[in-house]
Structure formats: C-alpha cells, structure tokens
UniProtKB/Swiss-Prot annotation:
Start-end of DNA-binding region: 21-86, 145-225
Polar residues compositional bias, start-end: 108-117
Organism phylogeny: Eukaryota, Viridiplantae, Streptophyta, Embryophyta, Tracheophyta
Encoding gene, per UniProt annotation: E2FF
Expression (tissue specificity): High expression in young cotyledons and leaves, hypocotyls, shoot apical meristem, roots and mature pollen grains, moderate in developing trichomes, flowers and at early stages of developing anthers, and barely detectable in mature leaves. Not detected in primary root meristem, emerging lateral roots, pistils, developing embryos and siliques.
Annotated GO CC locations: cytoplasm; nucleus; transcription regulator complex
SUPFAM superfamilies found in the cross-reference section: Winged helix' DNA-binding domain
Taxonomic source organism: Arabidopsis thaliana (Mouse-ear cress)
Location(s), subcellular: Nucleus; Cytoplasm
Name of the protein in its database record: E2F transcription factor-like E2FF
Broad class of where this protein is predominantly found: nucleus
Primary role: Inhibitor of E2F-dependent activation of gene expression. Binds specifically the E2 recognition site without interacting with DP proteins and prevents transcription activation by E2F/DP heterodimers. Does not bind retinoblastoma-related proteins. Acts as a growth regulator but is not associated with changes in the expression of cell cycle marker genes or in nuclear ploidy levels. Has no effect on cell proliferation, but may repress cell wall biosynthesis genes during cell elongation in differentiated cells.
C-alpha cells in the first residue's frame, strides 16, 4: 500500500497523469513514458524502474518500448533494458522502413512478414528466468512470444503509410492487409485491438492523425510524417510548463496585475475621493445660503468650493507624478513636459486672477 502511494506521489511530482488500464488508453501511457525519459541525461531505461515510476505492470511497458522501438526512439540493449535514442532517430528509421517496404512490394523480401505477425515469432533467443521470475514464467513467455508480433505489426503499419498512395487508411483495411486470416475469431479480434493500440500511440505522438472517410464517415488515419517530429517531441513530451501559444490573449492577466499595483500606490500616497464631511457639505448645503429668486448660490459657498477644488487638483497632480510613465522616446517625453509646463502656467494665472 505504501509503495503505491510513493508511485502516485512520484507521478504527480513529474506532472504525469495517473494511469488506469480500464480508463486510459495505451497512448496516455506512452505520453507519460516519453515525458519521463525525454531528457538529455537519460541513456539507459530499466523496464522495472519505468513500471514502478508509472505505476503499471511490466508487460504494459513492454508494449510501450516495442512500439517505440519500431520507429527508432529506443533500442534494446539487454534483458529488461533499453537505450534511449530520442526523436532525432525517427526520420532515419522511417527512411529505412520505406526502403524496406518498397523492396517488399517488388517481391525482393526474403521472408513473409504477415506469417510472422500471425505466428508471433520471437525476435531474440529465449532468456533465462531468475528465481524471482519463476512464478511469472508463463506470462513472461507470452510476453516474449508477442514481442516480435507487436514490434513487427507496428513497423508494417507504418510501412502502409510510407508506401501507399492513399491519403487515408482505415483500420479495417489495415487489418485485412497486415493480419492473416485466422479461424480463431478471438485471436483475430485480439490482433485488431493491438493494431488499434498502435494507431493510438502514433496518433498521440502526432505521427498520424485520426479522422474519417468523408463519404462513409468510417474512422480512418492520415499520415502527418516526420518533417518536424524531432522538434515537436521536445515541446510535446517535456516535463516543463507549457509555453503560451502565439496569439493567445493575455491582456486580462496584465490588467489584473496593473489593477493590484494601482491599488497599492493609492494607499501609499493617501489618495481619497472626498472626505465624508466635505461630501456632506457639498450635497446638503444650508438653505439660508440660497437666494430663491434667481436660484443661485451665494459667494460664501463659492469660496468653500474653491478650497475643495484646490485639494482635488493637488491630489491629481500627486497621482500624475506617481504614475508618470518612463518613455524612452525623447520626443514624446518633451511633449509631455510641454503640456505639464502649460498646465502649471494656466493654473498659476487662474490663481492670480481670483
């Protein structure tokens, strides 16, 4: 129980999604795997360590590395160990797959890959099991048996896009072309599900795009290619915070920041709209100060209003001096200075005429 909690905390610290086989697809697991190991300091990947950090069974990590190995991102180094090659190896691997696929179409292939996929041949010699693995020997043999099948099925699926003139390829057509007919319907459905998992993985990496046939509306996949997949990998599967996409609006964030800053400045300079007493005097003047013939206020009220006006003007000048922008343009700075001097002269002249 405690180990599960530690794995969950590690996944949260890396910004990975908590993986559940019943709720999440293999594409999510691959995305988490790439975010975990897509770093310059990673050279060797241990499958047991990856399974522990991602909180999944080791056989699921086998699925991940076999699909990634089919396009060159990782390479097998030893038992339960893979070396990290990175996204830069994808273009070279795709070129090799295309050349191999074209040779197979011309009939120069020395073996029948569809038979290999159907029979599930092993890609390497049987490995000796340790005492810890004896209890899981049956499942390990099944993993080794389907290892070649999944790796080869992923490569053949990519070859269909590289060597075909069709813009869209449906999953049904891919299954008919890649999977040999089997009398066992359950076995055939399992192979189709594996092909669907492979398609989801490549779609999560932006190697292909899931779409549909315009006429029949049947699900299909479009090849996106490897033109910039090396660069996209650095941005899609890194552990840092996502960058703001060009064109997104950030004005509201800056407005809120400026609003907070302005509020703090107002408190520092003691800015106030009006005193309560002055407001009450202005809104409720004495009735004796009004002449009801021409309905005009008397001179005593005018003197009081002049004092209030001077106070407001001083507050406005203090606020303007605090928020005076630091322009780099000398012409604009001189223009603002001209307006400031004109305002001071006008105010002094008005004060002398009173």
């Amino acid at each position: 129980m405690s180990s599960a909690i530690v794995v969950s905390q590690d996944a949260e610290s890396l910004g990975l999604q908590i993986y559940s086989r019943k709720e999440k697809s293999l594409g999510v697991l691959v995305s988490n795997f790439l975010r975990l190991y897509n770093r310059d300091d990673v050279d060797l990947i241990g499958l047991d360590d990856a399974a522990g950090q991602l909180g999944v069974e080791r056989r699921r990590i086998y699925d991940v590395v076999n699909i990634l190995e089919s396009i060159g991102i990782v390479a097998r180094r030893g038992k339960n160990q893979y070396s990290w090659k990175g996204f830069g190896e994808i273009p070279r691997s795709l070129d090799e797959l295309k050349e191999e696929g074209m040779r197979e179409r011309l009939g120069y292939s020395s073996s029948n890959n569809s038979d290999k996929v159907s029979n599930g041949c092993e890609r390497e010699e049987p490995l000796t099991l340790t005492p810890d693995d004896q209890e899981n020997s049956s499942s390990s043999k099944m993993d080794q048996k389907k290892e070649k099948s999944l790796w080869l099925l992923a490569q053949n699926f990519v070859k269909m896009f590289l060597c075909s003139d069709d813009d869209l390829i449906t999953l049904d057509s891919a299954a008919k072309a890649l999977l040999s007919d089997s009398p066992d319907s359950v076995h055939m459905r399992t192979k189709v599900r594996r092909l669907y998992d492979i398609a989801n993985v490549f779609a999560s990496m932006n190697l292909i795009e899931k779409t549909h046939i315009p006429v029949t509306r049947k699900p299909a996949y479009r090849w996106l290619g490897s033109k910039s997949i090396a660069e996209r990998g650095l941005s899609l599967f890194n552990s840092g915070e996502p960058k703001r996409v060009f064109g997104t609006e950030i004005t509201n964030l800056r407005a809120k920041r400026n609003k907070t800053y302005c509020s703090s400045i107002r408190k520092q300079i003691g800015y106030k709209k009006h005193d309560e007493e002055n407001t009450e005097q202005e809104s409720k003047p004495a009735a004796s100060k009004y002449v009801f013939g021409p309905f005009s206020p008397i001179g005593a009220s005018k003197t009081n209003n002049d004092k209030v006006g001077k106070g407001r003007l001083l507050e406005i000048e203090a606020l303007a001096s605090t928020y005076q922008p630091q322009y780099c343009n000398q012409e604009i700075t001189g223009l603002l200075g001209h307006f400031t001097e004109a305002w001071k002269k006008w105010y002094a002249e008005v004060d002398r005429n009173k």
